[in-house]
Structures are given as structure tokens and as C-alpha cells.
Amino acid sequence: MLYPPGAPARIPLAAITGTNGKTTTSRMLAHILKSSGHVVGMTSTGGVQIDGRITVKGDMTGPQSAQIVLRDPTIDFAVLETARGGILRSGLGYSECDVAACINVTSDHMGLGGIDTLEQLAKVKETVVRIANDTVVLNADDKLCLKMADNCRAKHLCYITMDATHGLVREHIRANGRAVVLEKGINGDMITIYDNGAHIPLLWSHLIPATIEGKAMHNVQNAMFAAAMAFSFNTDLDAIRMGLRTFDTSFFQSPGRTNVYNEHPFKVILDYAHNQASFRAMADLADRL
């Protein structure tokens, strides 16, 4: 029988929104999942990818792009970057997801589509968070992201913080909640997962090539989001570690995102940065290089 009763009709779906970091986090998560044996369909500002191969080029972060991926019969996992513009124009392109993340909410595209304040922008991005069934991953260092926790229907809430002393996150951990925390250690900064009372040291941040020896703090945060989402899909811990340790910022693996060139007497950083927060991230990286 081609479609026996009770046969699964859906695949796991991860949705990623926010102002900055969506594309890199999507690429990181897709790489982790592919490394662990999945055939991943992904949408991002770089195009539609099926199993690591670009099938449609361009900014593909809207509902039509999501439908391209979800209609593909060869994939067993979907990672969908979901941007503000597509939501305002035509919605999401999917009715629910398993795991959703909002990385941050900062000023970008203001004055377009009737969005004039950060609070209005946050409400648009919250659309993704509201439809997650299993886990919502939120930036605890961003007040607008934190407010989204009040409107989650998901079974689990996972906080991401770069501040190991964050009071709310520590309280969440004590209540057996899930969190990914950047903690200082003798060898550097350790990305640590807390879940249901367990304390799991995952990986030193400087061992992730995309962080450029731990200097690209924005990519440390992106890696924490990717790890949290992969963990929420019950991905093997060693597969998460291996995925992050084999993801770099070369033009071939992450075009247009923190590509550093050393072929000249000076360093060149190629990045898609186009708003104040992303410019600050690039300036911070330049100071650390």
C-alpha cells in the first residue's frame, strides 16, 4: 500500500526568525542535521537548498520558498529561514512547526509594511514562535524576545544567553528548564546545555571554525541557537559537536556571512551586515582580529 493508515505525512520542521543571524543559524542547523544523516531542505537569503545543493538562487525566505521545500519528496527534514517581509506579504507558508527560534529583534526595515516600532516588528516575528509545537528557542539577552515566551504553546521553552549569571535563565534552569549558556572556563568559553536537571558541556566556542577562534561573538550566539534547535530534535550530542566543528565561514560554506580573507597585507571581511546591530558585530570582530 502506497499510503498505509497511520503513515507519517509530515517531516520535522525548524523555523528561524529574527533580525540578524537567521541565515547563518539556518546553515549551521542544516549542516548539523545533514552530518547526522538527514536529507535537509533549507530556505535562506542565499536560496533554496536540497541536501546541500542550491536549487533556486536568490532571497528565498518567504512562504512560496517554504512550499518549494515542503513539496520536495526527497527530503526528511526542513529548515526554514522566515523573514519579516514574507510574513507581512503572504504569511508563513506552513501552519505549524516543531521547533521555532527568534534570535533577536533590532531595528531593520523600519517604516515598511506598516511597521514603525520595534514592538510592532517583534509582533511580526512572534508569528513564528506562536505556531511551534515542541520547542521555542528565545534569546534571553533580548527583552523583546523574552516577551514572546508569554505567547508560546510549545511543550518546551529554551533560553539562550551569553551571560552565565542571567537571573531569569538561572531560575529557569533550577526549575528543570532548558537553556544554552555561554560559561567561562579555564580554556575559554564553554557552550553548555541545561535540560531537565542535566548539565551538558557541549563545546568550547573557539573550536567552532565559524567563530574565528571565539572572536566572532555573533557566530558564537548563532552556534548556540543551532545547537539548541538540534538538541531539541534529539540529535546526538556528538553529531552536534561534529556539525559545529566542521562549519566554517568560507565563501563556499557560508557565502556573504563573515567571510575573512587574508590574501592581502590587511584583512578583508565580507559580510551582509546592513543595520546598526550587524555593523556593531562586525566592528567588534574587527577589533578582536
Where do the model's predicted regions map?
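Short beta-strand-centered segment that lines the nucleotide-binding/catalytic pocket of NTP-utilizing
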Residues: 36-51
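Buried hydrophobic packing segments
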Residues: 29, 33, 69, 223-233, ...
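Short, basic phosphate-binding NTP loop
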Residues: 1-15, 24-37, 245, 252
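Glycine-rich phosphate/diphosphate-binding loops that line cofactor/substrate pockets in enzymes
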Residues: 8, 285-289
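Flexible active-site lid/hinge loop adjacent to a nucleotide/diphosphate
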Residues: 54-160, 164-172, 207, 276, ...
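Adenine nucleotide phosphate-binding catalytic loops in nucleotide-utilizing enzymes
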Residues: 115-122, 153-280
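Conserved lysine of the Walker
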Residues: 22-25, 222
